Amino acid sequence: MNYVSTACLSERNLNQNLKTFKKLNIKNIELTGNILYEKNYQTILNHYKLKYGFNFLIHNYFPIPKKPFMLNLGTENSFLNKKSVDNCLKSIELCNQLKLKKFSVHAPFLVNFKTSEAGKKIKERKISSKTKILRIFKKNFNLLKKYVDSDVKLYVENNVLSKENFLNFNKQNPLMLTSFKDYDDMRQEVDFMPLLDTGHLKVSCKTLKLDFTQEFNNFSKYTDFIQVSDNNSFLDQNKKIKYGSLIYKLLKSLKNKKNTYSIEVYGQMKNFLDTLKILNKLNK
């Protein structure tokens, strides 16, 4: 099944965002952090689900908190740790209430950074111990598992490491889960399925000098959930998928596998609509 992220639209009001998708006859929606805080989000989602047959997934930062913060399930900061866990528990509660099938969260970061730095240059900070952060993440992730209904799957999305941030941290990686080796190491401690973000992986592979095709194929063996976008390999640009591109060919190689795809493509509406058209053809 193919979903479209709320982030594909510039409209940040939840009701107006969903109203636009309704006009486009798109009813499989991934809810994520581009939306503004909305007190009545449950009522709105119930309305679209029951009246119009919408299907929802939740990604990372939804429901939107009143005060923005950088969600990090591995942070050593006790205040941010509690906020991160509490927000994820709200997400899981919503999944349980609305019978949603998937909730995905970002892999942890080894530094605490501001929301204004997300997807941009991250100011250099002291990098925490990977072992310590993984231990905290394991505790939090296992806690979340206790609250999900049996038919709700939890996923962890691979982070994106740009060359700029890699060099800014003196060629040390301030993020977790930016390669398949990271996944292989993490799953020795934490049992989880990855959400494979193609755009994130493409940039990380360029930065770390890894073979993107090989990394994609390795990840795809361990997941049934892929977030789709393309870029120039240097920046996570959230561009549309084009026929004949490398990502198109890799997705085509999975056409016989029953995956869930989420489109996170920015810019003009035509961009994500073109990508949705391609995915619909691939997954007939």
Predicted regions and their residues:
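Histidine-acidic metal/acid-base catalytic patches
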Residues: 1-2, 14-22, 82-101, 112-125, ...
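A structural signal for short, well-ordered beta-strand segments and their strand-loop junctions
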Residues: 4-5, 28-30, 57-58, 102-106, ...
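Short, flexible loop segments at the rims of nucleotide/cofactor-binding pockets, characterized by
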Residues: 6-9, 34, 81, 170-174, ...
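Active-site-proximal loop/turn and secondary-structure-junction residues that shape catalytic pockets
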Residues: 8-10, 33-35, 62-64, 107-111, ...
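Alpha-helix-loop-beta-strand connector modules within alpha/beta enzyme cores
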Residues: 48-61, 140-147, 180-189, 248-254
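A short helix->loop->beta-strand "cap" motif at the edges of active sites that frequently abuts
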Residues: 52-54, 101, 150-152, 256-259
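Active-site acidic/histidine proton-transfer and metal-coordination neighborhood
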Residues: 74-193
